[in-house]
A protein has these predicted regions:
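Active-site phosphate-binding and catalytic loops of NTP-dependent enzymes
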Residues: 30-32, 99, 171-175, 198-209
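Catalytic P-loop NTPase motifs of RecA-like helicase/translocase cores
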Residues: 39, 62-64, 96-97, 124-125, ...
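Canonical P-loop GTPase G-domain recognition
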Residues: 113, 122-180
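Conserved glycine(s) of the Walker
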Residues: 16, 155, 246
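P-loop NTP-binding site
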Residues: 184-293
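Conserved C-terminal guanine-recognition region of P-loop GTPase G domains, centered on the G4
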Residues: 51, 75-143, 216-218
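Conserved G1/Walker A P-loop phosphate-binding module
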Residues: 1-75, 79-81
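Active-site glycine-centered loops adjacent to acidic/histidine catalytic or metal-binding residues
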Residues: 58, 119, 149
């Protein structure tokens, strides 16, 4: 008998969803920073064995959208409810409910298994943890609750084994050697965007999109040309920095991570362009891979 299914991870921003999926997959497929809204897309991470295949789905943190980009991000979360064979609802110690009650109300109405993971228990004491478990048992009575630390890999194997038990009987959805549904250029864009999230403050990181215009792969080196899109001319100057130093730092750090990711030398060219108000432009959002209604 072969088992396979979609295991979709939802939760508020910064609760550890991307860290969890990366831990399960064993590769850094989702970028991770301390900033909210780091994950913008729905990303599949695929784990296959001889008789099973788990398709994990990392999703953007749940927010109440303020503009078209955020609305598109929440559409990715909605789709995670619709095709889940198992839903992982991830919270952190001290957290109370989702930032949007519409999503929270859907959890208790689901017919598929729900695993509620209380993350970051390594930062808590036992009495607080017991209070949290009791609280969530009352709020989501149909969920199985697991205290975990995704960062420390505490209890993640227990959760994974339970997922395997709950998977429906099914053939594999993807080739057994495939790790994700995303193309190489997607990960180039995400790695560059991660460096921008890490090094720039306030609104700048949220006004940025990255597009890879060329990706030329040879036996020993990959030549990459990527464009950092901003919404205003003033943001372009901030991204570039004095004498280009800020952009150079992004390039150096991104190239280092890209070489680790692809396992070969990288020649990376970065450019900055103004794409006015792209976050509210449906055509531009579709161009960057976001669904728009």
């Amino acid at each position: 008998m072969h088992k396979a299914g979609f295991v979709n991870i939802i939760g508020n921003p910064n609760v550890g969803k991307s860290t969890l999926m990366n831990a399960f997959v064993g590769e850094k497929l989702s970028i991770i920073t301390s900033k909210a809204q780091t994950t913008r897309h729905r990303i599949f991470g695929i784990v296959s064995g001889d008789d099973f295949q788990v398709v994990f789905s990392d999703t953007p943190g749940i927010i109440k959208p303020s503009y078209a980009l955020q609305a598109s991000m929440m559409d990715f979360v909605k789709s995670a409810f619709e095709d889940a064979d198992i839903l992982i609802y991830m919270v952190e110690i001290g957290e109370k409910e989702l930032k949007d009650e519409v999503f929270f109300n859907r959890i208790n109405k689901l017919e598929v298994p729900v695993l509620l993971l209380i993350n970051k228990v390594d930062t808590s004491d036992q009495s607080t943890l017991e209070e949290q478990v009791a609280y969530w048992k009352e709020k989501v009575p149909r969920a199985e609750i697991f205290p975990i630390s995704a960062l420390r890999n505490f209890q993640t194997e227990v959760v994974f084994n339970r997922i395997i038990e709950l998977l429906p009987e099914s053939p594999a959805f993807f080739p057994k050697d495939q790790l994700t549904d995303k193309p190489e250029r997607f990960f180039v864009n995400e790695i560059i965007r991660e460096k921008i999230l890490l090094h720039y403050k306030e609104e700048i990181p949220y006004s940025v999109e990255v597009e890879t215009e060329s990706f030329a792969d040879s036996e020993t080196i990959i030549h990459i040309r990527s464009v950092i899109m901003v919404e205003r001319e003033s943001q372009k100057g901030i991204i570039i920095g004095h004498k280009g130093e800020a952009l150079k730092r992004v390039g150096v750090e991104a190239r280092t991570d890209l070489e680790k990711f692809f396992g070969k030398q990288i020649h990376l060219e970065l450019f900055v362009k103004v794409n006015k108000d792209w976050r509210s432009n449906a055509r531009q959002l579709r161009r960057f891979g976001y669904d728009t209604n």
